[in-house]
Regions:
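Active-site acidic/histidine proton-transfer and metal-coordination neighborhood
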Residues: 11, 40-42, 59, 78, ...
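Glycine-rich, proline-tolerant flexible connector loops at the mouths of alpha/beta enzymes
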Residues: 56-74
Length: 307
């Protein structure tokens, strides 16, 4: 073994923790592996071909917040040994008052994981929206200050839907604009963005939040009728209406570097799409579905110059 090879091996854990081996590591959302433990999840993610894992560090997730000091290092040892990155986790943290927030941040700093997905806010449907945003902003300010103290970045996931703060994107921009995106930022989900603005809205949202984005999530959908109502029908990557190539081209042009989370939130997976803790379809079928979408994702990433 040469000296250069030795140094590469010594650097591997740090690279795995930060995702520094690539600008855009494609990560599996561990919510879809809640039916098994860290060891099997890691082995399957390595087999399927993911660059990393977005661990659920929240109540009911792979890591419980109150046990993070003990459980996170054990999980990372397994994941990093397999050569997979952990550039982020998905957390339960809303603001500094969230139970175990400081404990989680301490563990993330110690582990060298720089980013976490930030749990979101909801509107009270009976109150004016501007007044509620004014009340939320100090909570964002305090979280930004806490993240600066720990050297961390919170990424606000953009969900679609009624009473979701951030669904319209402009409200999220108003909450983030006065703070450094290295402390509080967006985790821009293009599937949800397209559901909220399928013609031009998602394009404006990407232009608006692009400079504030530190993580992106990819999922696809097409409108589905349920009774008299139309709802997003989540589907396999490339089978819906999301323009992934245009989105990725735009987000790259905005200077984005960070984790890409691939979400599988459609019923073909028999419940594990929503975090079910047992399989209802054969494991071989699950692996084939995960591989199929990852391969489709990598094709579009190459077309956008991000692979």
């Amino acid at each position: 073994m040469t000296r250069r090879q030795s140094l590469t091996l010594l650097a591997a854990p740090a690279l795995a923790a930060s995702g520094a081996n690539t600008k855009w590591p494609v990560c599996m959302f561990s919510k879809h592996f809640q039916w098994t433990g860290i060891e099997q999840m890691t082995a399957l993610c390595q087999q399927i071909g993911f660059d990393g894992i977005d661990l659920t560090l929240r109540p009911g997730g792979h890591i419980e917040p109150e046990a993070v000091a003990e459980e996170l290092p054990r999980a990372l040892a397994i994941i990093h040994k397999a050569g997979l990155a952990t550039p982020m986790v998905t957390s339960h943290i809303v603001d500094p008052s969230t139970p175990h927030a400081e404990r989680v941040m301490t563990a993330l700093k110690k582990a060298g994981i720089p980013r976490y997905r930030w749990d979101g806010f909801k509107y009270d449907a009976k109150r004016p929206l501007p007044a509620q945003l004014k009340e939320i902003k100090p909570r964002v300010r305090d979280l930004a200050a806490m993240n600066k103290q720990f050297g961390l970045c919170a990424m606000y996931h953009t969900h679609s839907g009624v009473n979701r703060v951030g669904a319209s994107m402009w409200d999220l921009y108003s909450l983030l604009e006065d703070f450094s995106p290295d402390q509080v930022s967006a985790n821009l989900d293009v599937g949800h963005a397209t559901a909220e603005g399928g013609f031009g809205g998602w394009i404006h949202s990407t232009r608006l939040l692009g400079p504030h984005t530190r993580g992106i999530a990819l999922k696809d959908f097409a409108w589905k009728k349920e009774g008299k109502n139309w709802r997003p029908g989540w589907c396999a990557f490339g089978q819906g209406m999301v323009d992934f190539k245009q989105f990725l081209t735009m987000i790259k042009a905005a200077g984005f570097q960070g984790p890409i989370q691939l979400h599988y939130e459609y019923p073909e997976l028999g419940g594990i799409d929503a975090g079910k803790k047992e399989l209802t379809i054969p494991q071989e079928r699950v692996v084939a579905i995960f591989q199929r979408d990852l391969e489709a994702c990598r094709i579009v990433l190459r077309e956008a110059g991000m692979a």
